[in-house]
Amino acid sequence: MANDYISFVFKSLLLLIHLVFLGQHHVDSASVVKSLPGFEGPLPFELETGYIGVGEEEEVQLFYYFIKSERNPKEDPLLLWLTGGPGCSAISGLLYENGPLTMKLDVYNGTLPSLVSTTYSWTKNSSMIFLDQPVGTGFSYSRTELFNKPSDTGEAKRIHEFLQKWLGKHQEFSSNPFYVGGDSYSGITVPATVQEISKGNYQCCKPPINLQGYMLGNPITDSKIDGNSQIPYAHGMALISDELYESLKRICKGEYEHVDPYNTECLKLLEEFNECTSKLYRSHILYPLCEMTNPDCYIYRYSLSHYWVNDETVRKALQINKESIREWKRCDWSKPYTKDIISSVPYHMNNSINGYRSLIFSGDHDFEVPLIGTQVWIKSLNYAIVDKWRPWMINNQVAGYTRTYANKMTFATVKGGGHTAEYKPDETFIMFQRWINGQALYGKVKLLQKTE
């Protein structure tokens, strides 16, 4: 009897320890952040950070930054922003593209870098969730290696689950018009996530997410289309000669991505092409190609966020879970990731059929994902043109060019823009503001709500 009692007590203690462990690890956390190290005074906006667990046992903990709209959070749209990569932190969007703060561009001297307010934050008229995804990015993490191997389709499902749980804890935003946005590799993730949300709204999940549409900047969409557009783009921007371009077209027959290894003449021409373009900064061809350690280099600003985020006072202010403590990287390319969506064009087609609005925009000096390729896959959708190609203006100056289609898709270029919104943040903000408010970029007012 005594042994049975001891065994019972021992098992009870093990169960209690297990329950405590689960309680510590499976309770989602959220914290209101009133101030941040490096920023002078209280934050002039409402910031919340936290983790949402996804998976059967919430093995994956996704970290987010949530900023309420500065205009009317009760009614303004709610936007989920997904940074590209895959493997680039939400901080990239928040501090460099469309958030209310950015790094002050001072040379690092060993002290904590400073933050300053921006004038172009999309949170002026929308509430925004900046999400660290896929798992292993930023401060998101998995408790087991089994769940630390993300994929395109798997992340779309995780993001959908994240949204369901997040909205369950923030029910005051459940009726707000909801959008998903991103850039670069998010051209794969966002359309898949939109389709996953749409499918969930019809099949399983109540209350449904009030999904209205999505937006993408310089989106990676189809590796073949994107890759094959770089040579005609280079010719159009006078990066290669007419003679080289004509030879490439004739000898390679328009196929520059998957070249026949026996077509040695084509391979030699591609070497010549690379000689002409390899020294360019591909995210914006007018910017110099230089090292991140050089304070005069554009990308030096990225090193400042590395110093800032890895400071212990910043991690404490952001309420970072100790399980995810490690060296933070703005973009971590070393993580395993399965690219199981070859082309997101079918997802765009399905989302159009379901009636969702979309804004696709391209910085016209991006060599990574040239606007020519984006126009090719948009054309492949075979939707009628509603509004012809025309300039969109800011203060009577051309800010880019735009065209709209019968599937509620708007395409726009950003004049002087690069691979992400950060190269023309003011212009991109005005473009976003017009579109999210239901206006055509050139001024006509249109209905905002998706019709059922």
Curated annotation (Swiss-Prot):
Q: Which residues form the active site?
A: 184, 366, 419
Task: Let me know which tissues express this protein, per UniProt.
Answer: Expressed in seedlings and roots.
Which processes are annotated in GO (biological process)? proteolysis
What's in the keyword line of the UniProt record?
Carboxypeptidase, Disulfide bond, Glycoprotein, Hydrolase, Protease, Secreted, Signal
Cysteine disulfide links: 88-331, 252-266, 290-297
Tree of life domain:
Eukaryota
Q: What is this protein called?
A: Serine carboxypeptidase-like 6
Q: Which organism is it from?
A: Arabidopsis thaliana (Mouse-ear cress)
The beginning of the lineage is: Eukaryota, Viridiplantae, Streptophyta, Embryophyta, Tracheophyta
Q: Gene name?
A: SCPL6
